[in-house]
């Protein structure tokens, strides 16, 4: 059971980090879906 909890925490942290980066990058580029969708 502990393994599941640790995995969930790891995935959650990674997800939050990715979301933070993904939402922080777009504002810098006014054009939507230019080089990367």
From Swiss-Prot:
Main location: plastid
Protein name: Photosystem II reaction center protein T
Transmembrane segments: 3-23
Highest taxon above the source species: Eukaryota
Compartments in which it is found: Plastid, Chloroplast thylakoid membrane
Gene from which this protein is expressed: psbT
Keyword Amino-acid biosynthesis: no
GO cellular-component term (any): photosystem II reaction center
Subunit and partners: PSII is composed of 1 copy each of membrane proteins PsbA, PsbB, PsbC, PsbD, PsbE, PsbF, PsbH, PsbI, PsbJ, PsbK, PsbL, PsbM, PsbT, PsbY, PsbZ, Psb30/Ycf12, at least 3 peripheral proteins of the oxygen-evolving complex and a large number of cofactors. It forms dimeric complexes.
UniProt keyword Iron-sulfur, yes or no: no
Function, as annotated: Found at the monomer-monomer interface of the photosystem II (PS II) dimer, plays a role in assembly and dimerization of PSII. PSII is a light-driven water plastoquinone oxidoreductase, using light energy to abstract electrons from H(2)O, generating a proton gradient subsequently used for ATP formation.
Pfam families referenced in this protein's UniProt entry, alphabetically: PsbT
Species this chain originates from: Ephedra sinica
Family: Belongs to the PsbT family.
Bilayer disposition of the protein: Single-pass membrane protein
InterPro entries: PSII_PsbT, PSII_PsbT_sf
The entry's keywords: Chloroplast, Membrane, Photosynthesis, Photosystem II, Plastid, Thylakoid, Transmembrane, Transmembrane helix
GO biological process, one term: photosynthesis
Cysteines joined through disulfide linkages: none
């Amino acid at each position: 059971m502990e393994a599941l909890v640790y995995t969930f925490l790891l995935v959650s942290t990674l997800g939050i980090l990715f979301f933070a980066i993904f939402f922080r990058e777009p504002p810098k580029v006014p054009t939507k879906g230019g080089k990367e969708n």
